[in-house]
A protein has these predicted regions:
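C-terminal functional module detector
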Residues: 1-203
Length: 203
C-alpha cells in the first residue's frame, strides 16, 4: 500500500502468479476500472466445457442475500459431467437429474457460485437457465471466451456464461504490461486472480 510520486506518464506493471489451482483469469485494475482481463489461453483452444456463474447481492448490509434456486436444461445436446463451484453449503441441492437437466439451490451475498458443464457436443443445442431472478435461452455456439452477462440490478447481481478449456494446466504465469498514469488522481494498481476452483486472490 505504499504511495509513490512520479513524473512519468506510464507505469510498468509486472504480475507473477503461482496458484493452488488452475487460473481462470487475471484482472488488472486501476481503482474501480478494469484495464485488462487476461486469460492464459486462446479462443482456438476452448473446448466443450461451459461455465455458468451466478453472483452479486441485493444491497450491502442485512437482507443482502440473493437466492438463485433454479435449473438448467439442454435441448439438442447432453451433459456428460457437471461439477459445482463454491458449493459450501452441502445441504443445498445440486443434482444432475438427467443427461439434459440440472437443478440446484444456492444463494450469494456478494460472492459467486455456479457449475461447469462438460457437453457431449461442442457447439450444438440451446441452454435454458431458469431462476427466480433471471431466465435465459442461450445458443451453445454463441458461448465463447468472453462472458455473456445477464444483469438483474443490485450490486453486480447477474449470471455469466462463458467457455473454458476442457483441461486447464495453467497454474503459474507471469505477465508484464505498461499502463498510462492519470495525472488528475491517485493511481491504485492491483490485480484480482480468479482460480478455476472459485477462489479469488487479491494483491
Amino acid at each position: 500500500g505504499d504511495i509513490l510520486s512520479t513524473r512519468d506518464a506510464e507505469l510498468s506493471f509486472s504480475v507473477e502468479v503461482s496458484g493452488s489451482a488452475p487460473i481462470e483469469r487475471i484482472e488488472l485494475r486501476n481503482g474501480l476500472e478494469t484495464l485488462e482481463t487476461f486469460r492464459p489461453f486462446e479462443v482456438a483452444s476452448l473446448g466443450k466445457r461451459i461455465r455458468v456463474i451466478w453472483e452479486g447481492s441485493e444491497y450491502r448490509g442485512r437482507g443482502r442475500e440473493t437466492h438463485w434456486d433454479g435449473c438448467a436444461e439442454l435441448c439438442g445436446n447432453t451433459f456428460i459431467k457437471v461439477l459445482p463451484i463454491n458449493r459450501y453449503n452441502l445441504s443445498k441441492l445440486f443434482d444432475q437429474q438427467s443427461p439434459t437437466k440440472i437443478k440446484w439451490e444456492s444463494l450469494t451475498t456478494g460472492g459467486f457460485a455456479g457449475f461447469d458443464a462438460f457437453l457431449s457436443e461442442r457447439d450444438n443445442g440451446v441452454l435454458k437457465i431458469r431462476t427466480e431472478l433471471i431466465e435465459e435461452e442461450i445458443n451453445i455456439k454463441d458461448v465463447g471466451l468472453e462472458d455473456l452477462m445477464f444483469e438483474n440490478g443490485g450490486i453486480n447481481r447477474r449470471i455469466r456464461v462463458f467457455r473454458m478449456l476442457d483441461k486447464n494446466s495453467h497454474v503459474a504465469l507471469k505477465i508484464e504490461r505498461r499502463f498510462p498514469l492519470k495525472s488528475n488522481m491517485d493511481n491504485a494498481f492491483y490485480v484480482c486472480v480468479t482460480q478455476e476452483d472459485g477462489h479469488l486472490t487479491w494483491s
